[in-house]
Amino acid sequence: MNKYSQYVVQNPKYEVGMEGLVKGRQCPTMTYMSNELVPGSNVYVELGWVWDIPDPNRIPEHQHANSDEFVFHLGSDHNNPEDLGGEIEFVVGGETLNINKTSAVYIPKGVIHGPLIWKSYTRPHIQMTMILNAGTLAEAAPAGYKGE
């Protein structure tokens, strides 16, 4: 093993959501970075493929009191990588954002965000969240997870 191989995650954890809980998207999603996977990383990164309008079609309102968050929506068309392959309505701080291109949204700690709702869908895309200063699922609390 070389010096930095301990920082490479090729086998994610599947810990956010239960299989069959949401139709039209990967569930559970894949956790690619956490203190459990890379001790001391102190960041939580999870992602999942969306292959249809999810059902239920709603990520609920929530906030991260101690952590900044980035939410990415990544299109899959290699000929037009900026095209998301769908349209999403995302409420951040009480303002509605309409997203139809590959994008990154910065959400400062403490800002209430959600719901996030798909309005249309044309091709698979990836939804990814990165929560800083949160090294565990319980600290990150993605999608309103409360440890239940």
Which ranges hold each PLM region?
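Short acidic (Asp/Glu) patches
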Residues: 53-57, 92-93, 109-113
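Double-stranded beta-helix
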Residues: 1-12, 18, 118-148
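A short beta-loop-beta micro-motif enriched in histidine and acidic residues
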Residues: 55-70, 78-85
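Conserved metal-binding segment of the jelly-roll/cupin
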Residues: 96-119
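A short, N-terminal "cap"/entry segment at the start of jelly-roll beta-barrel domains
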Residues: 1-60
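Beta-strand-enriched cores of mature, soluble protein domains
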Residues: 19-41, 68, 75, 116, ...
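Extracellular structured ligand-interaction cores
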Residues: 67-71, 85-87, 96, 125-127
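A short beta-strand-loop-beta hairpin characteristic of the jelly-roll/cupin
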Residues: 75-100, 138-142
